[in-house]
Amino acid sequence: MDYQYFEEESDYIDLDEEEEDDDVVTAGSLDHRFGQPNGEEDYYFGGDDVEEELVVDGHGVLELAGRLLESLQSCVQPSVLQVMQYVAPMLLLCLLCRLLCLLYSQRRRLTSLAPLHLFHFACGLIILQITVGYRLLLLLLLAAVGYLLLQLLRLGRRGAQVLAVLTVGSQFLYELLIWRRRSDWPQLRGIQMVVNMKLISLGFDLTASGQLQARIPGPFAYLGYIYSPATCALGPWVSFGCYMDCLVPRNSWLVSLRRLLPNVVICVLAVTVSNCVAPALSDFFGDSSHFLVMYWDALSVRSSHYFVGMMAQALLVASDQRLDGATKESDMLGPLISQPWRIEWPRSISSLVRSWNIPMHEWLKRYIYAPCKPTASTSRGRILVVVLSTYLVSSLLHGMDLRIYLVLISLAFLAEGESLLRRQLASLLNACITANLCPGKERCRYSHCPSKRRLNSLSYWLARLTNLAFTALAIFHLAYLGVVLLGDDLEVGEDGDSFLWHWQQAGYLSHYIGLGTFVLYLFIS
């Protein structure tokens, strides 16, 4: 998923430039489902002998408990075991790379950085060999092509733009013409997407003032950056400068281990919810409420994303690799890739999608949105073009997936409409009900702000209820859009239902609501 890009007058007093630009949409993530046994529906059974007095809304409490217990026995244990088998080697290799770099850097004279790059490259290759097997050869071939494309930077800023177009376009055409029907490409696509983001960022960073500012990295530095063990398998994107700053570890081992444990625990919980709990609840509520079915199915997708994000955070912590941007590290978790608490209970659509993949948000804002950044006098049509262009680049980075295209365009439509409407309402009512989080009573520009009012104030409760209504609406949109991403393909299933079946059953309500927000905004503006 992506980011809400919108620029106008500041909602709050003294907002710095970073906060003004922070309305963008992330796309995406790598959605994997580990350890889910085949024939999962066979594990959820029962309830035929439930007593009638234990029935709530037509469903037995004992039936639900029985299904969850069966899921615990038949699904959770194999899921956790498979995840640990997948995670442990990656963590150990990241720790090994960190140890080797630390030992080498303690020499009296650090005459060359080449060994540090080689440590990263070697450990990254082993991780990819464990992850993708023989297909690693294809990734190395694509990396070699990428290094050749870097030579275009000698043309200056135009060379960086050509590099970006060729990098994104080549992956799109490669999948379209050759790999569309290959079952192994979807896994490689996520890895190659991160590589492409690194190439593009490196090109623009080296030609920031219109000409080549520094020497193009040598082969060792390039391979160490592209295949660093902290980011090569699951991401996220980090800039070349950030990679160089973290070549020599600085944090203590105790701090890293303290942060590593909660990331692994949350990772296990996320895969348990994704593979076992959410499918069981979706099956149980299947006959009662279509919204609940959509919500639990979408929760399975989101939890899969949380698993990947938390696993990637654990690898960053193990390698002592920091992230770009102004986002502060969490004392408990370290560098943050995703913020599930802001996704599951969002203030707005734009806030939840900004929290979906924070490094990708930073990449899109820095290299796609900022160069086309609209000014205060820019027309509304120009702003819309910039927003759609950013979403288009984000979609192309993910390769050919019609579901992602539909979700991203829908998010652009919904988030922009909500942001415009709430900004206009906040201005008319002088109330803190915009899509952005309130910065506190000292900086909020609105008189009717909950942080400035007491509990017995009417304006306090009106602002709270308005924000709560938009939160509930964002949760509905989250379920409506997320359920489309469930599954691996676009083909019609055995029961004849297409991947848009849930949208059809909901009457495309979310899209009509989005259209209504635009109409209401135009009416009151």
Curated annotation (Swiss-Prot):
Catalysed reaction equations from the record: [Wnt protein]-L-serine + (9Z)-hexadecenoyl-CoA = [Wnt protein]-O-(9Z)-hexadecenoyl-L-serine + CoA
Entry membrane topology: Multi-pass membrane protein
EC number(s) from the headed UniProt entry: 2.3.1.250
GO MF, one annotated term: acyltransferase activity, transferring groups other than amino-acyl groups
Localization in the cell: Endoplasmic reticulum membrane
Chief place where the protein resides: endoplasmic reticulum
Superkingdom field: Eukaryota
InterPro entries per UniProt: LPLAT_7/PORCN-like, MBOAT_fam
Transmembrane segments: 83-103, 125-145, 159-179, 220-240, 260-280, 301-318, 395-415, 467-487, 505-525
Function field: Protein-serine O-palmitoleoyltransferase that acts as a key regulator of the Wnt signaling pathway by mediating the attachment of palmitoleate, a 16-carbon monounsaturated fatty acid (C16:1(9Z)), to Wnt proteins. Serine palmitoleoylation of Wnt proteins is required for efficient binding to frizzled receptors. Also facilitates the glycosylation of Wnt family members, including wg and Wnt5. The cotranslational disulfide bond formation of wg competes with the N-glycosylation. Porc stimulates the post-translational N-glycosylation by anchoring wg at the ER membrane, probably through acylation.
Quaternary structure note: Interacts with wg and Wnt5.
Protein's name according to its UniProt entry: Protein-serine O-palmitoleoyltransferase porcupine
Provenance organism: Drosophila melanogaster
